[in-house]
């Protein structure tokens, strides 16, 4: 991270908290005994201490991340209809923005099926 900071005008350093495909059960299976929200909060504090430029977290944890990380927040796990598929911690774009997300990562809700129709649905969702 120190090397990144030396060239910080060119490169942005972004930290990832806990993948949106993981929930408390999955975390326990890999050896973590803390609640996912507590782990995300801890990771956000570390990101702040490391002076990262942005952080990636589930839209469900944005509010707790904002308590300790004041820079940009990027949120994957965005679903228009909340069908989670393999993701565990998802919200709609409107909910994510309401929680304080700065940037959304939207993959399958756009790329699965008719892309043009999906983009129009997304625009419609955001304009309501």
Segments predicted by a language model, with ranges:
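Conserved, mostly hydrophobic/aromatic
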Residues: 47, 65, 96, 107, ...
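C-terminal helical cap(s) of enzyme catalytic domains, especially alpha/beta-barrels
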Residues: 1-7, 97, 109-128
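Generic alpha-helical propensity signal that fires on short helical segments
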Residues: 29-31, 73, 91, 96, ...
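Glycine-rich phosphate-binding active-site loops on the catalytic face of alpha/beta enzymes
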Residues: 80, 89-93, 97-118
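Glycine-rich loops and low-complexity Gly/Arg-rich segments
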Residues: 37-42, 97-101, 128
């Amino acid at each position: 991270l120190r090397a990144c900071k030396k060239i910080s005008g060119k490169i942005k350093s972004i930290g990832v908290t806990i993948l949106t495909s993981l929930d408390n059960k999955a975390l326990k299976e890999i050896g973590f005994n803390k609640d996912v929200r507590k782990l995300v909060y801890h990771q956000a504090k570390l990101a702040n201490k490391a002076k990262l430029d942005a952080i990636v977290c589930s839209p469900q944890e944005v509010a707790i991340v904002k308590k300790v990380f004041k820079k940009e927040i990027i949120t994957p796990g965005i679903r228009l209809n909340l069908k989670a598929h393999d993701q565990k911690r998802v919200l709609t774009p409107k909910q994510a923005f309401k929680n304080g997300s700065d940037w959304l990562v939207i993959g399958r809700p756009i790329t699965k099926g008719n892309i043009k129709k999906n983009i129009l649905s997304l625009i419609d969702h955001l304009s309501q």
